[in-house]
Amino acid sequence: MQLYVVTWRSLCFYLQVRAAMLPRAFRCARRSVARCNHTQASSGRTTSFGFKTVPEEDKESLVKNVFDSVASKYDLMNDATSFGVHRLWKDTFVDSLKPGRRAPMKCIDVAGGTGDIALRILDHAREKYADRETSVQVVDINAQMLAEGQKRFKKTMYHYSEPCSRILVAHVNSPTAPQVSFHEGNAQELSPEQFKDNTYDLYTIAFGIRNCTSIPAVLQEAHRVLKPGATFACLEFSKVGNPLLSA
């Protein structure tokens, strides 16, 4: 299995501004943390949530509360807080993977609710390689984020109205399989009936793995659903250890 992990220097200003734009969501999250702090003693295991440390068992619901609050404004918020730079990062990320080069590819985009990465994958395959068979299954734990993805694809050439799975299917005049579908699911525990072993050529997760409670569980599931020799690709913020690169 090939491994692509694209990391970028942590942008403290970006994160601070982003946090400032979500006061209501984070106030709700802080109240939730306060209400459930008593559970920490029961397990003793903690994990990060933004700039806080919270009990492991509470992180999933806290993340859901935040994204429920910002789903309709998520893409606009990313544009405002990164001055549009997040689009360049995502373009570079997808371009480096060359989806469609070996058509058709079966892809899974996890934590990809609004369809940002899925749309780029399909556009790249079509525009660079005239590939209209590559497909993407978008998975997200948050139904409201998936709903935003539906809205986005309704404005594209990939949309048609016949439903599939739990959310939506879209395609490009294909008589066989649809090119994109949206599914509610947990990256740490993908349904083995729906997401079968050794199925996908490409697994992507962009700015999502930090929101997962157990990264090892996410990686284990990614390994399970990917074909032998397939590609795992993660786009995420990180600190650069090499002082020459971080200067």
At which residue positions do the language-model features occur?
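Conserved alpha-helix/loop element of class I SAM-dependent methyltransferases that forms part
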Residues: 73, 83-106, 120-124
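A short SAM/SAH-binding and catalytic strip from SAM-dependent methyltransferases
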Residues: 201-215
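N-terminal auxiliary segments of SAM/dcSAM-dependent transferases
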Residues: 23-26, 33-65
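Class I SAM-dependent methyltransferase SAM/SAH-binding core
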Residues: 105-192
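A short glycine-rich, Lys/Arg-flanked "PGG" loop and its adjoining helix->strand segment in the class I
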Residues: 216-228
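Conserved class I S-adenosyl-L-methionine
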Residues: 231-247
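Short beta->alpha hinge that forms the Motif I/post-I loop of the SAM-binding pocket
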Residues: 140-141, 214, 237
